[in-house]
Structures are given as C-alpha cells and as structure tokens.
Amino acid sequence: MTTQNPVYASQAKPWLKYYDQKFIDQTLPALSAFEYVCQRSKNHLNDTALEYYGRKFTYADLIVNVKKTAAALRGAGVKKGDIITVVSIMTPEIIALFYAADMMGATLNLVDPRYSVEGIREYIEEVDSHLLVCLNVVYDRCSQAARRTNVEKVIVLSPADSLPPAMAAGYKLTSPDKNKYASNVIRWKKFMAGGKDQSTAAEPYDPDHACVVVHTGGTTGSPKGVMLTDDCFNGIALQFQAYPKLFHRGQKLMNVMPPFIAYGFACGIHLPLVLGFTVIIIPNLDPAKLGSLVLKHKPEHMFGVPTHYQQLASDPKLRDKDLSFITNYAAGGDSLSRGAEQTVNDFLAAHGARYPIAKGYGMTEVSSAATVAAGLDNKPGSVGIPMVHTVVAAFE
C-alpha cells in the first residue's frame, strides 16, 4: 500500500482560479520604484498625478520635481547607500523626496512626527542618518532629537510649500513659523536651489536596494525597522493590476494615510501612481471632515482603517447622498468586526456603491497586503484570497 504525499494549498494555489492567466504570467519588472512610475506614465504625462488642496501636478510635473529633488539631495551631500530620516506628514515634497532618494540609491527612514524626542533620536541612531528632513511644526523636537547623533544637516519643509499661492499666504498668516533655526538648517526652497548644478542621473536598478525603512506597530513584539525594497513596492502595484474591473487609469484615490507606514506609501501613493490614478493628498485628516472630503472629491478609491468607514456610515452629511462613484474603499491596519462590516456594507449599498467594503490581511514586511477581499470576491468576515503572486501557508 502506498501513501500519497498531501498536496498543500500553498503548493496547489487554488486561489489562482480567481485570476486571469495573463496576470498569473506577469513578471516583476527589473526597475526601481521611480522607473516603474515613469515607464507606466510615459504616454500619459499630461494626466494629473497629484492634487494638493486644489493645486494639481501632472505626471510630467512629478517626474521633473523628482529629478530636481535628486539633484538637491546630491547638492546636500547625499550619496548612494545613505539613509535619510524623514519626520513628516504626507506632502508633495515628501512624495518627490521618496522617488528622488530611490532613483539615486538612497533610502528614506520614515518616522511618525508624533514621536517623542527620545523616540525620534532612537530611530535616527538606528540607521545612522547624517541628514534629517522634518516638518517645521515638529522642528523643535527634531532638533533636540538630533543632538548627540551624527546628523549634520536638517532640511525643514512647511505644509504651505506646495499650497496654491493665496492659500499659502493665508496659512502663513494664521500659522506663522516661530522657530529659531540652528545654523545647520536648510529651508526647503534653499535646499532645492542647491541642486542647480548637480546631476539628475539615476543609479542602475539594484534588486537589493531598500527604498524605505518603516517601523512596525509592535503587534507581534517590540516595534522594529523594516527595510522594503523597490521590488516590495513594485510587487504590490503589479499584483493590484490583476483586478481590472476595479482599477482603471484616470480614476482618483484619496490618500488619508501617513507616509510612515508601509500601507500609506505603498498603497496610498506608489500603487495609484503606477496604475495611472490622480492621488488626492489629505495630509492631516480630521475624521469629522471625511464625509465632506468624499463628497467634494468623489474618489473611486480609498485605503483606510476600519474607523474611517464607520465614520462615513454615521455621517449625517451623507444621509441622502449618491455615492455610486465609490468603487473600492478598502479597510486594513486593524481588525474589522462582522457587525461593523455589515453596518458599512449596508450604508454603501443604500447609497449606490457597487461593491461592499474591501478588506485585506498583511503586515509591514509585505508592504501592506498579502490577501485581498475586493469587488464581488468578498465574503463577510473573510480577509479574502492571496494576491496573484503571493503564497500563503499556515504553520503550527
């Protein structure tokens, strides 16, 4: 009598029946994250890539800004292999900085601006940064954190740097910058001017290059820094192309997630730019205004946490509104109870949305999602099926 070896799901991959063969056969491009955005947008350079408080940046604008920022980094002494610590919310400058560091072989160490002086210092020392980039509103904490570290220069940016002119003037009147800056501080505009005579050449693609260091939430232990490569970011963007009924060039995604988590940058910025979306940047979300923002911008897509969608479902401003533009509003980053999921799904259906709330399961180490429940392949209480090039297995 012979005993057959069991065929494990991780070998048989039964979830592939949900995907078209052309997506199963796709291979990861040997490109940096920035090169992938450039390749995908080369015939759509006049499309809008980013929108920030009404100011729009085309894909051509984005690419030019990235190259200018790379030149400025070289002017500030940044070299291939350097790790730059960034303490900021999401702004157009941070997006350009991410791709600029990526194209020149450097890495961003993304830190939550709410951290204490000691917390920021710990993350600076962890990667031995010589350059620190921070938001002006957290400069005081960052300058204290940088003491007794190897930080030589501090680049300071303002949320107003990319605002439309009238709005920027109003912001500076209502929120004047009262910081007393040290001699090693360079303001963003001066930093950019320092790249005038510097190279904008890109380093060759390196499969081992880490484009970011992000820090885990400590769910399975103490928080730790995770290095994510270009392939990690591009892998997420490639796999989401396997949902052609949901994702189309020219759609809008409202980004409400911060840059210092993998979910925020991989799904909230890189993924939509690779797919040809317009990313509407909401840098510091007031949850009470989420419903108004959805009505104003009418984004087909949003990546958020469960509480965002519970907030929408209970918002009286949305009570009689048509939300049929909603295509894929996805919840991640926290657990979603069956009751809360049903409440949100009832709300979406009552307001004309075609699909229930999308869900996923993953971790920082996989750049966010490993499994996805989206569109009509979405069972209540389930975290979905593995993404097309992801292998999932259960271990005791």
Model-derived features with residue positions:
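Conserved AMP-binding A3 loop
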Residues: 58-60, 202, 211-235, 373
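Structural core segment of the AMP-binding/adenylate-forming
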Residues: 75-76, 103-190
